Regions:
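Structural signal for alpha-helical transmembrane segments and their membrane-water exit/capping regions
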Residues: 8-10
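Hydrophobic helical h-region of N-terminal Sec-dependent signal peptides
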Residues: 2-6
Length: 472
């Protein structure tokens, strides 16, 4: 009995049993919760009160704004890299004796274009206007002195690299026979006036302007027409006025081969351009949003489809998978998707790219047949496929198409051709009649590197015309 009593006395009571029960697992905060709690404590310490919904919204908006700045600038830097891509493509697809000249034209396109766009072009394109035709404020970034909005700087650099892209398209179409000084005049004129005026019609409301074409609902998200077709039609005007290279066409009118001296350079250039397009199209959101993922996918699919389609088309009709056609096919697909990259499906992007790859092959052959000498196919890639891409943006619009949409797209395409080709045709004729547009036959035969710049890209025996079997 004594043992039982002792045992009973040692048993814990109900309350004691609860106190000695195993404790429940502690709740462990996540890293995000710790950071959030620390932020709240810091706000409380600094302001003496807990953050409100309004202050949280302001903080989130500030983060989004900074992200928009960063993405827009990164995209601008990617598009700037496209200048190197154009230089490599054009240099590789032309003869060695003109390599320095082509590189210098591309460099000066950006240099002269940046100054002209800062001085005049940006104000014409994005300045305030009440007519829908062109802006009249914001020259030399003067708006910053008025509103002190730093977004102006990010937006300006992004639009400047676009303007320079439109200008450099012409370089390839007029390669190997254009006076360097005359080309500089063209570059300034296009970036100061021709490109900005049409840009104001289609994109003016992106800043302070507003254009008649965008008022109709014109779809050109990243510039199949605004950038590429404007540059392509200017290239067509230049090629028509300056005429073909010496020896390009025989007495019977048939084209003679003048192969580029280094298709490896041209291929590297296409890779750089493709890479830069991931800034060109997704960057046109000018916002760090989830939309950039789909735009990047559409861009890539169209470029890939364009290359494959051009390869198959060339293989079928030319009996060889011609490298220049394949390279231009990739670029054609990228140009074609630029207008609709934000408003079509991935499947539609593939279709757009495939058709662009077919179109560019036949377009290059067509211009050769009518004796318009375009050494790199710039007119076909940018002018023709830019027009196709603009039509496709309306035709494959994910939200549906209509006769009104397609009519507006056609109006935009025709307006771009009439404005860019007409204006540049007159400009090139004036230059031709005054200071001269074309080098002499002697200079053209010897190469523009030596006569225009006093330089050589390669040693005298690196690319011997005799050894390589190339035309002089």
């Amino acid at each position: 009995m004594l043992g039982l009593a002792l045992w009973a006395a040692l048993l814990p009571t109900g309350a004691a049993a609860q106190d000695d029960a195993p404790p429940e697992p502690a709740v462990v905060a996540t890293a995000e919760e710790v950071v959030a709690a620390a932020a709240v404590e810091e706000v409380v310490e600094q302001e003496g009160a807990a953050p409100t919904a309004e202050s949280n919204a302001e903080a989130i908006a500030a983060v989004q704004t900074n992200a928009d700045y960063v993405w827009t600038l990164v995209a601008a830097f990617l598009v700037f890299l496209m200048q190197a891509g154009f230089a490599l493509v054009e240099t590789g697809m032309t003869r060695a004796k003109n390599a320095v000249n082509i590189c210098m034209k591309n460099l000066m396109d950006f240099s002269v274009g940046s100054l002209a766009f800062w001085l005049i072009g940006f104000g014409v394109m994005f300045g305030a206007n009440s007519t829908g035709w062109f802006g009249t404020t914001g020259f030399m970034l003067s708006d910053y002195a008025t509103d002190n909005d730093p977004w102006l700087f990010a937006f300006w650099i992004f639009q400047t690299v676009f303007a320079a892209t439109a200008a450099t398209i012409v370089s390839g179409a007029m390669a190997e026979r254009t006076k360097f000084a005359s080309y500089l005049l063209y570059s300034a004129f296009l970036t100061a006036l021709v490109y900005p005026v049409f840009g104001s019609w289609a994109w003016g409301s992106l800043y302070q302007g507003g254009g008649w074409l965008e008022g109709r609902g014109f779809i050109d998200f990243a510039g199949s027409t605004v950038v590429h077709s404007v540059g392509g039609w200017a290239a067509l005007a230049g090629a028509v006025v300056i005429g073909p290279r010496l020896g390009r066409y025989g007495p019977d009118g048939k084209p003679r081969a003048m192969p580029g001296h280094n298709l490896v350079l041209a291929t590297l250039g296409v890779f750089l351009l493709w890479f830069g397009w991931f800034g060109f199209n997704p960057g046109s959101t000018t916002a760090a949003s989830t939309d950039i993922a789909m735009i990047a996918v559409n861009t890539n699919l169209a470029g890939a489809a364009g290359a494959v389609a051009a390869m198959i088309t060339a293989w079928t009709f030319l009996k060889k998978p011609d490298a220049t056609m394949i390279l231009n096919g990739a670029l054609a697909g990228l140009v074609g998707i630029t207008a609709g990259c934000a408003n079509v499906t991935p499947l539609s992007s593939v279709v757009i790219g495939l058709l662009a790859g077919v179109i560019v092959v036949f377009s290059v052959l067509f211009f050769d047949r009518i004796r318009i000498d375009d050494p790199v196919g710039a007119i076909s890639v940018h002018g023709v496929c830019g027009a196709w891409g603009t039509l496709a943006a309306g035709l494959f619009n994910a939200e549906g198409t209509s006769m009104a949409i397609m009519t507006t797209q056609l109006i935009g395409i025709v307006a771009a051709f009439v404005w860019a080709f007409g204006t540049m045709f007159v400009f090139f004729w004036i230059v031709k009649a005054t200071v001269g547009l074309r080098v002499s036959a002697e200079e053209e035969a010897a190469g523009l590197d030596a006569f225009e710049h006093g330089n050589e890209a390669y040693g005298p025996d690196t690319f011997s015309a005799t050894a390589a079997g190339l035309p002089a």
